[in-house]
Amino acid sequence: MKYTLKILKGSNEFVLKELLSKYPNTEILEEYDERILFESDIEIDEYRNLYSPTHISNENNKVLNLSRRDWRREFVPAGINPSLAYIMCMIADLKQEDILLDPFCGASTIPITAIMYFDIKRCICIDISDSAIVKSKQNFLNAKIEENRYKLFRKNIQDIKLNKRNIDVIISNLPFGIRVGTHDENVQVYTKLEDLANRLLRTKGRIVLLTQEKKLIREVFKNWDIHSITQIDEGGLLPEIFLIKRK
């Protein structure tokens, strides 16, 4: 049977990595910016455990929405696509013992993804919005995640008082200053984020950030080892995913 995976533009490498790690006998036929064609004897419904593509279809025109998550019933404006959240977790190279911080958690798509599909130890979810925290709580309940594996805080990033250096990874969908916030606000917010990371991140910790503010993120993290991993086409915007580590 021939299949087509619909993917986010810029995510080929990660979709192929997931597909071939879970189904190593897959025969890749063709690759394009927004789709991958492959052949396999496996039935289409078995591919529901692929989380980085957005859709899969077969030659009989049956289509599955792979980005839909049953637990994700609450949403926030400018929230992250669940497939993209999964890709960011792949880039972070998550481990079971990791403690994750998302300081702009929205409805907690990234933290829930990290716990459910990468089995990390625990996550700390922070957002300035009361509504986001309420929606996060509901999504965690929907996902049936034990309460001792997550903490939710309604805080402005400038008011976060955590000081213990025990965070293994920070993953976040940052304010772009386009759909949410402004560039001037982002200068302050991103500067505070760098200070927070410097305070809380372990020596060998990792930071994975999605942002449209490409120049700003490089300026703010100029004393870190920062790399742009890929540019993603997300609804007409072209943010980049940055991987950042201590020098």
Features from the language model and the residues they span:
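Class I S-adenosyl-L-methionine-dependent methyltransferase catalytic core
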Residues: M1-Y23, L29-I44, N60-K247
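Conserved short beta-strand edge segments in small beta-sheet-based binding/regulatory domains
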Residues: L50-N61
